[in-house]
Amino acid sequence: MAEKFTQHTGLVVPLDAANVDTDAIIPKQFLQKVTRTGFGAHLFNDWRFLDDQGQQPNPEFVLNFPEFKGASILLTRENFGCGSSREHAPWALTDYGFKVVIAPSFADIFYGNSFNNQLLPVTLSDAQVDEMFALVKANPGITFEVDLEAEVVKAGDKTYAFSIDAFRRHCMINGLDSIGLTLQHEDAIAAYENKQPAFMN
């Protein structure tokens, strides 16, 4: 079972860049591991750090600003997660501490991989995202409330509606990954297997 996602209130960090690809999210030299942990240290490595090893923070990159330390909601621009289809990208984002990414659009494969890893991709219009960027710029350190059950984001005095496929929404709210979904049908699977001839078991 994965962690359940119903509502989340978190600090918002604005990454004002379009077409952020998966190589920018987690560079290829850090992909050797097959477990989901440890990638957060290298999230946006080429932007966050001045050196390849990730030892010297870049003071001009937004994730390194003190007011955004501990951010769990990433606000960004269109076509986020484009490029190669590495699942390490949502792994790096969640390992860093992000629960939600808000953007006008996402690359299809990244979008699907996000749900598989309990990272909620929220799609809003360009105009709505523009409003949010202005709000965060005027109020650095602001928090947004994301309610998956009601499918709304509360930002300042405004509420923004979004839509998530019913099946994906159900899985996130109930903390169901592919294993969890299979276990929901464990009794039916066992009953089916018991009906098979002995040589098939």
Swiss-Prot record:
A Pfam family the protein falls into: Aconitase_C
One MF annotation (Gene Ontology) recorded for this entry: 3-isopropylmalate dehydratase activity
Annotated GO CC locations: 3-isopropylmalate dehydratase complex
| UniProt pathway annotation | Amino-acid biosynthesis; L-leucine biosynthesis; L-leucine from 3-methyl-2-oxobutanoate: step 2/4
- The EC code for this enzyme is 4.2.1.33
Key word Ligase present in the record? Answer: no
Reaction(s) catalysed by this chain, per the record, are: (2R,3S)-3-isopropylmalate = (2S)-2-isopropylmalate
Keyword annotations of the record: Amino-acid biosynthesis, Branched-chain amino acid biosynthesis, Leucine biosynthesis, Lyase
Q: Which InterPro entries match?
A: 3-IsopropMal_deHydase_ssu, Aconitase/3IPM_dehydase_swvl, AconitaseA/IPMdHydase_ssu_swvl, IPMI_Swivel, LeuD
Please list the GO biological process terms of this entry. L-leucine biosynthetic process
Q: Quick check: keyword Amino-acid biosynthesis in the entry? A: yes
Stated role: Catalyzes the isomerization between 2-isopropylmalate and 3-isopropylmalate, via the formation of 2-isopropylmaleate.
Give the record's subunit note.
Heterodimer of LeuC and LeuD.
* Recorded family membership: Belongs to the LeuD family. LeuD type 1 subfamily.
Instruction: Indicate what this protein is called per its UniProt record.
Output: 3-isopropylmalate dehydratase small subunit
Question: Which organism is the protein's source?
Answer: Enterobacter sp. (strain 638)
